[in-house]
């Protein structure tokens, strides 16, 4: 675990999550600003959120994995794909990034267009319980799409993961906006709520729904549909951040072998 945290790659990944979430929240919320000359449409907002996540997954995914969402990060932890410490750092970076993105937009947007900064709320007489189920379903399909399209074990063509993920986010918004404004991402809900200081009694919906939905998708995908072949010892090592794949051990062995040969000469 100490080795993982002390690496430059780790801190690059954490910063990438901060930056990606900042940009995602800025563009996503920005598409929902209520300009007097042209109010936003459901389609406009849905496409903007999808384009934002797809662009960022393509640009910064290779650095951090492109989670950009605490629900996805926690689901990958449950799915034994990342370490506990990485999950903690990622979630913290995502939440701070979301606040920063919402704060920048608040500062830039004129008062007559700012509105409530697209703070998530229950719409059309949706009860908190139903809203939670809606968020669960929306995030479940998003998480399944992410896990499947980025699974390195797949041998069949998967196309562009960034495009698939972007379309999944767009799909969720096309349905979810009518119920909850569509969160699917606790950071997306948390950022503007902090900046606007508008935490409704139903704010928990935008944490519980997405997190439970993503975790259920992780259990289904990583333990039932496509279970890992790792031993219990290796699974524990993944959570602790000390796991090294066999190919890494082979690389290390070759490097040591070359070093010994050079020293011998």
Swiss-Prot record:
This is Aquaporin-5. Pfam families: MIP. CDD domains: MIP. PROSITE patterns: MIP. The keyword Lipoprotein does not apply. It catalyses: H2O(in) = H2O(out). Residues 66-74, 181-191 dip into the membrane without crossing it. A motif (NPA 1) lies at residues 69-71. It comes from the Eukaryota. Homotetramer; each monomer provides an independent water pore. Interacts with TRPV4; the interaction is probably indirect and regulates TRPV4 activation by hypotonicity. GO terms for cellular component: apical plasma membrane; basal plasma membrane; cytoplasmic vesicle membrane; endoplasmic reticulum; microvillus; plasma membrane. PANTHER family: AQUAPORIN TRANSPORTER, AQUAPORIN-5. Salivary glands, lacrimal glands, corneal epithelium in eye, trachea and lung. NCBIfam families: MIP. The keyword Repeat applies. A motif (NPA 2) lies at residues 185-187. GO terms for biological process: camera-type eye morphogenesis; carbon dioxide transport; cellular hypotonic response; odontogenesis; pancreatic juice secretion; protein homotetramerization; saliva secretion; water transport. It is a multi-pass membrane protein. Glycans are attached at residue 124. Its main location: membrane. Gene3D superfamilies: Glycerol uptake facilitator protein (1.20.1080.10). InterPro entries: Aquaporin-like, Aquaporin_5, Aquaporin_transptr, MIP, MIP_CS. Aquaporins contain two tandem repeats each containing three membrane-spanning domains and a pore-forming loop with the signature motif Asn-Pro-Ala (NPA). One of its GO terms (molecular function) is identical protein binding.
